[in-house]
Amino acid sequence: MKRLLLIVLLIMSVSVFAQSERTTDFGGIVSAEAEASLGGPWGLSAEEELRFDHNFSQFDRWLNSVGVDYSCLHNRMNIGLTADYVRRHNDRGYYENRGRLGLQVTYTEEYRRFKFQVRSKAMGTFFDERTGEHRVNPRLYWRNRLKVTYQPMNSRWKYALSTELFWLTDDPKKGGLDNLRTVLSVDYRLARRYTLSAFARMDNDLWVNNPVDRFYLGLTLKAKY
């Protein structure tokens, strides 16, 4: 099974970079996240994010997110619902409002100092239709992520690597697998409730017209109550 997964990932990687006329972009992300327990298996979350692209020269996106989640199976499984407001710079050169709803299921297993997470997420993006330029509304994605985390014993440091596939489900002309995201992160626990995370992220367009490879550097302040 591991060999099969490795072969699939290698084939996908070769296919991604074999596409002609790929362009490259660099950007940055600054965000803050907070989690709070509601007692028992229930919890709340919130996130604020600012993202820059075009070689750090353009403000690309402002995101506000709130969510509620439920843990079960001795905290191995987490089911969450999120609602997002996004203010994003689009391809036509102006900022538009977007709304997003997401439903996700995350399963976690631990082995010694390693943590393995598999997340499956259904996400719908709702566009502002006053301009009439969106052919598909809402746009529905199915996202699947594998994340491996390592934390040395008695250490404030934590290291993680994840890969995520984006599958567009409701566009008859462009539907299918269209993005691969890879994230490498390092977390440092500042205090009992606060953690600072630095990360590098790579987003690769797959099998689309005018594919772009986007590279981001980011910082996230995390709080847990």
What role is predicted for each listed range?
Residues 36, 70-72, 107-109, 150-152, ...:
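Residue-level signature of outer-membrane beta-barrel architecture
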Residues 9-17:
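Hydrophobic h-region of N-terminal signal peptides that target proteins for export
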